[in-house]
Amino acid sequence: MSIPKWIVTDVKTSKSYELHLSFSNGKKGIFNFLSELQKPIYQQLNDLDFFLTAHVEDGTVVWNDELDIAPEYLYENSAF
């Protein structure tokens, strides 16, 4: 069984609310998070210091035990 291409293997954050992502298929992309900040679930990420704590866990980007984002969504909406 092959690993899905959209599994996140690494993330770096930027102060401009970008996620610089590496995926399991070797592609690297940039996901602009600014439009996501409008969504109620991501309101706490308006705190830049908290946004910058993003890390990879179980193949996707997470901030804490309650907040993550679907890796498929990141892959489909990243600029490559």
Feature locations, PLM:
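Motif-centric detector for short Cys/His coordination patterns
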Residues: 1-80
